[in-house]
Amino acid sequence: MSNRVIIFDTTLRDGEQALAASLSVKEKLQIAMALERLGVDVMEVGFPVSSPGDFESVQTIARTIKNSRVCALSRALEKDIDAAAQALSVAEQFRIHTFISTSTIHVESKLKRSFEQVLEMAVGAVKYARRFTDDVEFSCEDAGRTPIDNLCRMVEAAIHAGARTINIPDTVGYTVPSEFGGIIQTLFNRVPNIDQAIISVHCHDDLGMSVANSITAVQHGARQIECTMNGIGERAGNCSLEEIAMILATRKNLLGVETGINAKEIHRTSNLVSQLCNMPIQSNKAIVGANAFTHSSGIHQDGMLKAQNTYEIMTPESIGLNRNNLNMTSRSGRHVIKHRMEEMGYSEQNYNLDALYEQFLHLADKKGQVFDYDLEALAFMEAQAAEDNFYQLQQLVVQSDSTEGVATATVRIDVGGEIKTEAATGNGPVDAAYNAIARATDRRIDIISYKLSAKGEGQNALGQVDITAVYHEQNFHGVGLATDVVEASARALVHVMNLTCRADKVADYKQNMHKNRELGGV
């Protein structure tokens, strides 16, 4: 049996299902490219039949990614498989992942079929998917609660039909390690053709067992783990990619397996996913939390000064986190910024040095010292602003009356090349700024969540504002970054305005396309 564990990332499929607002195609592509740098073997990037947007994002990623295998999900239905195959056809190499429920409660209550009918559907789906690719994965949904006799029959039949990867999901996070390991061991003992496929696991974290169950499965012969960055996913989330990667690396002598993950990309990829998905990382999160390498106990600090491995089983450098947060000032030249970005793992293709340096100088003038985490935040915002925007905030002036609690905001905005200046009052400076922006853009949206977080340390830290807004019954996520909270809030709103503007253009395009089809058919 191979000692190589395949890392199957499903951040852009299962992970995205947990988000309040869908990611744009550009944002999904950013994450996909980061996952490729991270070294994931397979990335599941969407469910093409579910929506035109998902189809487009899968196709865009499939066309771009070269070093990881791109995968799309489909139910055990021919129309789903057709959509997946069509979206993936532009890829150099791809996988179709088809699934059906196998537990008694799912078969009877959800599918309302007999197990024999479900078995027949599974076999038919695998055979149909094999028409498009040799790389077909089949999942037994809710395998953790499936009677073991039925599970063995399903796995044997799917392999015989042509599946080269068999996925055993603990869909509702119900099992414990000894139980889940026993399921994997039983499959190896009882399925006669199991050597013709790779056994995969996909564990959810409802009882906090996803990582432990996945590691136990590897000890019993599984050689693919399905996971997400930061463990994001439905309900309590999925198995965390960064935890799996570092467990297998740190305990290699015990577990005897390895992955192809470039661990030095973990920190950067984790931050990108957190920012784009608007899902902050808890400070005590294993591997990537802010406190993961922090030692506050005096005894621990003394030990660390004498020998780092007294209290560190891995180093921050091993995940790409540099201990030396070198401070930079407005006197630092472009070469310093370029060097620091290279030290953090960013190539010049990942950012615009001139634009980043201009933003750096602006920030350095405001706060004096600029640190690595500031640069990363600026690079992230510079990448977000790289698209052509219909609305561009040029100036924001706010005045507050502390006695009456009323604020006045004046904004100057470039609206499609026309400069508009508007003023408005509100219940506080942020409300006033939002009202002024709404006037200038003549675009009304409903904000359903507002979140403020600090990016950096001290009183001059950058403030990041994340908002979720509803426009035409669709959720949009905007982000703004500035040393001033009101400015960050305004930038987040303008970001959302631009997203809704693009959504309108897409809707108009689709409407015209349908009209042209109707005219052509007359």
UniProtKB/Swiss-Prot annotation:
Cofactor(s) of this protein: Mn(2+)
Region (Regulatory domain): 392-522
Pathway(s) the chain acts in: Amino-acid biosynthesis; L-leucine biosynthesis; L-leucine from 3-methyl-2-oxobutanoate: step 1/4
Subcellular location(s) of the protein: Cytoplasm
Keywords, in A-Z order: Amino-acid biosynthesis, Branched-chain amino acid biosynthesis, Cytoplasm, Leucine biosynthesis, Manganese, Metal-binding, Transferase
EC number of this enzyme: 2.3.3.13
GO BP terms, alphabetized: L-leucine biosynthetic process
GO annotation, cellular component aspect: cytosol
InterPro entries: 2-IPM_HCS-like, 2-isopropylmalate_synth_dimer, AIPM/Hcit_synth_CS, Aldolase_TIM, LeuA/HCS_post-cat, LeuA_allosteric_dom_sf, LeuA_bact_synth, PYR_CT
GO molecular function per UniProt: 2-isopropylmalate synthase activity; acetyl-CoA C-acetyltransferase activity; manganese ion binding
Residues reported to bind Mn(2+): 14, 202, 204, 238
Gene3D superfamilies associated with the record: 1.10.238.260, 3.30.160.270, Aldolase class I
Pfam families from the UniProt entry: HCS_D2 (PF22617), HMGL-like (PF00682), LeuA_dimer (PF08502)
Reactions catalysed according to its record: 3-methyl-2-oxobutanoate + acetyl-CoA + H2O = (2S)-2-isopropylmalate + CoA + H(+)
Residues of the Pyruvate carboxyltransferase domain: 5-267
Known function: Catalyzes the condensation of the acetyl group of acetyl-CoA with 3-methyl-2-oxobutanoate (2-ketoisovalerate) to form 3-carboxy-3-hydroxy-4-methylpentanoate (2-isopropylmalate).
HAMAP family: LeuA_type1
Quaternary data: Homodimer.
Family according to the record: Belongs to the alpha-IPM synthase/homocitrate synthase family. LeuA type 1 subfamily.
Annotated protein name in UniProt: 2-isopropylmalate synthase
Gene from which this protein is expressed: leuA
